[in-house]
UniProtKB/Swiss-Prot annotation:
This is Gaegurin-LK2. It is found in: Secreted. Pfam families: FSAP_sig_propep. GO terms for biological process: antimicrobial humoral immune response mediated by antimicrobial peptide; defense response to fungus; defense response to Gram-negative bacterium; defense response to Gram-positive bacterium; killing of cells of another organism. It comes from the Eukaryota. Expressed by the skin glands. The keyword tRNA processing does not apply. Residues 23-44 form a propeptide. Belongs to the frog skin active peptide (FSAP) family. Brevinin subfamily. Has antimicrobial activity against Gram-positive bacteria S.aureus ATCC 2592 (MIC=2.5 uM), S.aureus ATCC 43300 (MIC=2.5 uM) and B.subtilis (MIC=20.0 uM), against Gram-negative bacteria E.coli ML-35P (MIC=50.0 uM), P.aeruginosa PA01 (MIC=10.0 uM) and P.aeruginosa ATCC 27853 (MIC=5.0 uM) and against fungus C.albicans ATCC 2002 (MIC=5.0 uM).
Amino acid sequence: MFTMKKSLLLIFFLGTINLSLCEEERNAEEEKRDGDDEMDVEVQKRFLGPIIKMATGILPTAICKGLKKC
């Protein structure tokens, strides 16, 4: 009976460790995926800012020259 309790305790202990390791790995993967999304948004912000500034500078002159009312 004592050896059976020992083996059951060992199985329970190893199962608990296995579950905690899987949970840590899953959390790390989620953080990795979340970090990529944040990086994509940051790159988009960096990319769109200068383009919008250029468009606001070029667009009025293009319209003016296109309509020939300058």
